[in-house]
């Protein structure tokens, strides 16, 4: 049971990171497919959103310090550096706020697909 749970966590993390690495290249019409992928993790959506938060925490940390030692996603340094150079502090803040807002909306039973679409749009814009 333990290795199955660990592999689920790894799959969830890999899926979230893959999406975040290519979010700026995704066209709007591809969002539906991305949301369908996220839907696979609907039961663990808070964990999925936490992974996204950690990703943007790493981007913010690198942008502020240019130090890779404090990063959680150490194996993704190249992509973190790339996104840190493209993102502004206010953009990262907007994304982190959107992640929190998504959690609140999901707790309030707002339509899952709509919440994810708004979140992905905010991430893409920033």
Task: Show the residue positions of the predicted features.
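Short, well-ordered beta-to-alpha junction loops that form the rim of enzyme active sites
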Residues: 1, 72, 118
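Single conserved hydrophobic/aromatic residue that forms the stacking wall/gate
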Residues: 1-6, 10
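General "foldedness" signal
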Residues: 5, 37, 66, 110-113, ...
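Long, well-ordered amphipathic alpha-helical subdomains in the mid-to-C-terminal portions
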Residues: 11-100
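Charge-biased C-terminal accessory regions appended to nucleic-acid-, cytoskeletal NTPase
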Residues: 87-126
